[in-house]
Amino acid sequence: MYVGRFIVVAPDRAAYRVSSRSFPNRRIVDRDGTLTVGPTEDAPETDNPYISYNCLRTVGDDYAVVGNGTQVDPIAEKLSLGYPPRDALAESLLALDYEKDDYDTPRIAGVVGDESYIGTVRRDALIVEAVEEPTLVATYEKSEPEPTSLGADDPSELAAELYDRDLEHPVCAAGVVADGDSFEVGYYNGE
């Protein structure tokens, strides 16, 4: 099944996977603790605004944010200004809305912290829910948050776990795990 990009958020960890039929030549790089999706060196040039973005950011030792696009940055910024996680997620998703591409691709994002949330904004809905167990939401087919499993405790292993899920067209994945008073991040580019 092709579900597109997806996230899994749990109370103490989260992960994000890029799945793509159209733009498979992407990878994740670590830029001082911020994980960024971008094209590989052999990727064809494109003016598509949805190809490169920060997919995982931490906000001090308090929060981690994951998502499938540029909404990660304003969510992190609002959290750093003291917004509650639910409000930072809802306001940023609502402000940016779904992606204005040929598919009206939903934006998905999650926050891990003292309170953890998952959210999506689609053409027909804005959904933000508290997370008590591992919860998945995807851009296609699984566009409503639903319970799932999440086993790994190491961020890179968590990313590999999502990459290896039996869902079509994996490209790369990112993971974050709460480690006491801070967060550890990792990624997997299928190598």
Curated annotation (Swiss-Prot):
<keyword id="KW-0658">Purine biosynthesis</keyword>
<dbReference type="InterPro" id="IPR020600">
    <property type="entry name" value="IMP_cyclohydrolase-like"/>
</dbReference>
<comment type="similarity">
    <text>Belongs to the archaeal IMP cyclohydrolase family.</text>
</comment>
<comment type="function">
    <text>Catalyzes the cyclization of 5-formylamidoimidazole-4-carboxamide ribonucleotide to IMP.</text>
</comment>
<dbReference type="InterPro" id="IPR036795">
    <property type="entry name" value="IMP_cyclohydrolase-like_sf"/>
</dbReference>
<keyword id="KW-0378">Hydrolase</keyword>
<dbReference type="GO" id="GO:0003937">
    <property type="term" value="F:IMP cyclohydrolase activity"/>
</dbReference>
<dbReference type="GO" id="GO:0006189">
    <property type="term" value="P:'de novo' IMP biosynthetic process"/>
</dbReference>
<dbReference type="Pfam" id="PF07826">
    <property type="entry name" value="IMP_cyclohyd"/>
</dbReference>
<comment type="pathway">
    <text>Purine metabolism; IMP biosynthesis via de novo pathway; IMP from 5-formamido-1-(5-phospho-D-ribosyl)imidazole-4-carboxamide: step 1/1.</text>
</comment>
<protein>
    <recommendedName>
        <fullName>IMP cyclohydrolase</fullName>
        <ecNumber>3.5.4.10</ecNumber>
    </recommendedName>
</protein>
<dbReference type="InterPro" id="IPR010191">
    <property type="entry name" value="IMP_cyclohydrolase"/>
</dbReference>
